């Protein structure tokens, strides 16, 4: 199993949710986040003064999936979130040793 951590632009949230749903993902954790990287920060001018934010707003999804589904999910997310410009985001792929559904005690793929 894998844990996919997706970092995307807030404007792509609904498209990514639809892509995950179309890929058979029944649930995800979605967190508002901010970060910095190649995109740098944003600057705005207010009453003649420039204000600079060092971070950019992002949305983070966490999704558990079976190993065999990883490639198709990544491709669907890249198609949904990608613009080809700096700041599109990242996908982190982590080995997931186990999952436990609290309500039933199911483990592994059955708990996803």
Go through each PLM region and give its residues.
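Positively charged, small/polar-rich N-terminal and surface patches that mediate targeting and assembly
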Residues: 1-112
């Amino acid at each position: 199993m894998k844990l996919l951590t997706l970092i995307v632009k807030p404007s792509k949230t609904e498209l990514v949710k639809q892509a995950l749903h179309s890929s058979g993902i029944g649930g995800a954790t979605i967190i508002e986040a901010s970060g910095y990287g190649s995109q740098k920060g944003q600057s705005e001018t207010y009453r003649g003064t420039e204000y600079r934010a060092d971070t950019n707003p992002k949305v983070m999804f966490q999704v558990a999936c079976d190993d065999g589904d990883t490639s198709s999910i990544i491709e669907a997310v890249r198609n949904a979130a990608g613009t080809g410009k700096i700041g599109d985001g990242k996908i982190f792929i982590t080995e997931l040793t186990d999952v436990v559904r609290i309500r039933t005690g199911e483990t592994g793929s059955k708990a996803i």
